[in-house]
Amino acid sequence: MLSILWNLAAFIIALGVLITVHEFGHFWVARRCGVRVERFSIGFGKALWRRTDRYGTEYVIALIPLGGYVKMLDERAEPVAPELRRHAFNNKTVGQRAAIIAAGPVANFIFAIFAYWLVFIIGVPGVRPVIGEITPNSIAAQAQIAPGTELKAVDGIETPDWDAVRLQLVSKIGDQQTTVSVAPFGSDQRQDKTLDLRHWAFEPDKQDPVSSLGIRPRGPQIEPVLSEVQANSAASKAGLQAGDRIVKVDGQPLTQWMKFVTFVRDNPGKPLALEIERQGSALSLTLTPDTKSVNGKAEGFAGVVPKIIPLPEEYKTIRQYGPFSAILEATDKTWQLMKLTVNMLGKLITGDVKLNNLSGPISIAQGAGMSAEFGVIYYLMFLALISVNLGIINLFPLPVLDGGHLLFLAIEKLKGGPVSERVQDFSYRIGSILLVLLMGLALFNDFSRL
């Protein structure tokens, strides 16, 4: 319950910030173009708070935080007094109206740059993309990528950390040939490997894209050595102590901690014969895991904590820049995200990416909560990502979106007169239906992932 409330709070804050940024873009440019703004609303429905400024603009925070709008004076919506007609939106030039409409998405892109600027000034911790293990028969295994190598570049784009690797690889989903440059850790002797990503599919909210390719990043090592044994646990009753190294389980040699975890989890209430090493001496013990119910299924539980060897410092990176350099890096990062978003949307349309990859508000809320838990840097990065997506999607040429309005203005400029109201009304209905269908599909995908 607490996690749901946390996700919801993080989602509402994110939505409020991004909607305010988007609508402020429309508002600011409208004011600069001499258009009278009657209302600036964050949310829909009943007003929870309202205030009117000296220019007559009413500012509103409404009950339903799923959008917002800027209401401008417009003769097409209501009669306008003669002395105010020059302040009506419809009486401005095509260029001015286009600037007002485009200002919302542009504000989202500027916000993303600002968020990344803050991130790069604070410093982004990362891990060099060194491969720990390769899953047999995976896409990475078929490309003959070896453990212990470092992913230096994807299709010529340098990848200094795992986040850069993920960004570049996801943009290549559905491609037949993607070239990755690898080198032994600490070496610059690169080799090119080719990935076939035509059949690559993963669930973004459940799977790491790198892991779904069969690549396990080099991380902290977890040894089959106990660092802690909980009091009154199954392990304590079996006589296990901190410092014990587990050598065998039921006669099977043990070199990886996760193998021990699997043995314990799969054998609730069943005795397991352990061979351990304690201060240089070999001992035999019997461990009978306690039983716990996890999602309605009985699982074994021992009550131990393994010894973890931290990742060596040479594997760690931090991307941190001065104020000016951070602007350049933030702009480049935002541009990369914009290209990725357009690329992925294009592949959704062509079918190269399956529609079940489309995410809706539930997945976004989960992402908001998770990033907020990790800290301010990751929450800012999440806001930047969603802000870019919001800006790109709003530029889609659907009549109910900013892109649709820009399309009508382009037609007006070409033909020398506005598109007829009948055509606009029909287009708005079609656009609304398509948008509802798209939102319905995104929600369906969200619920199917729960």
Swiss-Prot record:
Recorded superkingdom: Bacteria
Top EC category: hydrolase
Pfam families per the UniProt record, alphabetical: PDZ_6 (PF17820), Peptidase_M50 (PF02163)
Transmembrane segments: 98-120, 376-398, 426-445
Location in or out of the cell: Cell inner membrane
GO biological process: proteolysis
Domain PDZ positions: 115-186, 199-291
EC code: 3.4.24.-
Membrane topology: Multi-pass membrane protein
UniProt: Zn(2+) binding residues: 22, 26
Catalytic residues as annotated in Swiss-Prot or TrEMBL: 23
Disulphide-bonded residues: none
Recorded GO CC terms: plasma membrane
GO MF terms held by the record: metal ion binding; metalloendopeptidase activity
InterPro entries tied to this protein: PDZ, PDZ_6, PDZ_sf, Pept_M50_Zn, Peptidase_M50
Keyword terms: Cell inner membrane, Cell membrane, Hydrolase, Membrane, Metal-binding, Metalloprotease, Protease, Repeat, Transmembrane, Transmembrane helix, Zinc
SUPFAM superfamilies: PDZ domain-like (SSF50156)
Family per similarity comment: Belongs to the peptidase M50B family.
Domain remarks in the Swiss-Prot or TrEMBL record: The 2 circularly premutated PDZ domains act to negatively regulate protease action on intact RseA.
Extra remark beyond the main annotation: Regulated intramembrane proteolysis (RIP) occurs when an extracytoplasmic signal triggers a concerted proteolytic cascade to transmit information and elicit cellular responses. A membrane-spanning regulatory substrate protein is first cut extracytoplasmically (site-1 protease, S1P), then within the membrane itself (site-2 protease, S2P, this enzyme), while cytoplasmic proteases finish degrading the regulatory protein, liberating the effector protein.
Subunit structure: Interacts with RseA.
Function: A site-2 regulated intramembrane protease (S2P) that cleaves the peptide bond between 'Ala-108' and 'Cys-109' in the transmembrane region of RseA. Part of a regulated intramembrane proteolysis (RIP) cascade. Acts on DegS-cleaved RseA to release the cytoplasmic domain of RseA. This provides the cell with sigma-E (RpoE) activity through the proteolysis of RseA.
Protein name from the UniProt record: Regulator of sigma E protease
Source organism of the structure: Salmonella typhi
Highest classification ranks of the organism: Bacteria, Pseudomonadati, Pseudomonadota, Gammaproteobacteria, Enterobacterales
